[in-house]
């Protein structure tokens, strides 16, 4: 695992009126960018010290590395606010498909003990997508989020129900598994951890998805899978397969550090390692 400390490219020139793509191309063409890419590919290099970028320039520089590197990146910012700004900048450049936010599961501070369901979904989505081995993921987080333990990879695998279009599976088996995972049977799903059955259709709201899934069967065969809007019930996107995950904080054995969960080839980027370690220690639960 390599560690990148923010950041080291300085550009000079008139950048007024440039689009985000044009600015990104300026950073990509900088000679120091080639040096950075070479250092990150060198497995003998464990730490790279960088300097020279301020504000959104760090996001532009980071986006070039993320786009051209297949291994995951984890950017650790100082706090929720700073991480939020950095995440917003990256999504403006790279889109939202590969850029993920890993927040604390608590609404305010860990010490108040108030969980936030939306944050728990984001955390579970990150773990689920890392477990799948997706390439090019970029994760933005901060010390309070890293202080919380997560489930192990084995635990996540054991508690994940995978379904694919064309697969033959007994609907009773699915509902039994959902029940064993702690999902609540309801007439209509409206929040994570719920499922509903209407004829040949099973609606289920996974803790690893922003939207619930509608799984349509033809006999015992999965005919289609779609995400849908809770309020309008209208379909959003077709899926070839899905992973359904329960509330891991309740059903799982939460004993693993997030930094132990991520792949070994992950690049970590942070401003101050010693300060970060101290902050995680203070917030540790």
What does each model-identified segment do?
Residues 7-282:
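ASCE RecA-like P-loop NTPase motor cores
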């Amino acid at each position: 695992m390599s560690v990148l400390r923010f950041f080291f490219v300085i550009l000079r020139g008139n950048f007024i009126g440039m689009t985000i793509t044009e600015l990104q191309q300026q950073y990509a063409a900088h000679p120091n960018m080639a040096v950075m890419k070479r250092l990150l590919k060198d497995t003998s290099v464990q730490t790279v010290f960088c300097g020279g970028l301020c504000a959104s320039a760090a996001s532009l520089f980071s986006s070039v590395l993320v786009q051209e590197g297949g291994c995951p990146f984890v950017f650790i910012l100082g706090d929720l606010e700073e991480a939020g700004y950095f995440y917003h900048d990256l999504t403006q450049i790279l889109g939202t498909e590969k850029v993920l936010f890993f927040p604390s599961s608590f609404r305010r501070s860990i010490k108040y003990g108030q969980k936030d369901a939306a944050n728990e979904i984001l955390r579970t989505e990150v773990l689920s997508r890392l477990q799948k081995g997706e390439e090019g993921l970029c994760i933005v987080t901060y010390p309070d989020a890293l202080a919380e333990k997560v489930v192990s990879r084995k635990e996540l695998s054991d508690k994940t129900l995978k379904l694919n279009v064309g697969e033959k599976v007994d609907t009773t088996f699915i509902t039994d598994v959902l029940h064993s995972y702690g999902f609540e049977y309801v007439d209509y799903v409206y929040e994570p951890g719920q499922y509903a059955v209407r004829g040949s259709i099973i609606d289920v709201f996974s803790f690893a998805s922003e939207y619930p899934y509608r799984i349509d069967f033809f006999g015992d065969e999965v005919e289609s899978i779609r995400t849908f809007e809770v309020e309008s019930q209208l379909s959003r996107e077709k899926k070839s397969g899905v992973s359904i995950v329960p509330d891991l904080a309740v059903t799982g054995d939460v004993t693993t550090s997030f930094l132990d969960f991520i792949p070994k080839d992950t690049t970590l980027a942070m401003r101050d390692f010693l300060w970060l370690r101290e902050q995680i220690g203070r917030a540790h639960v």
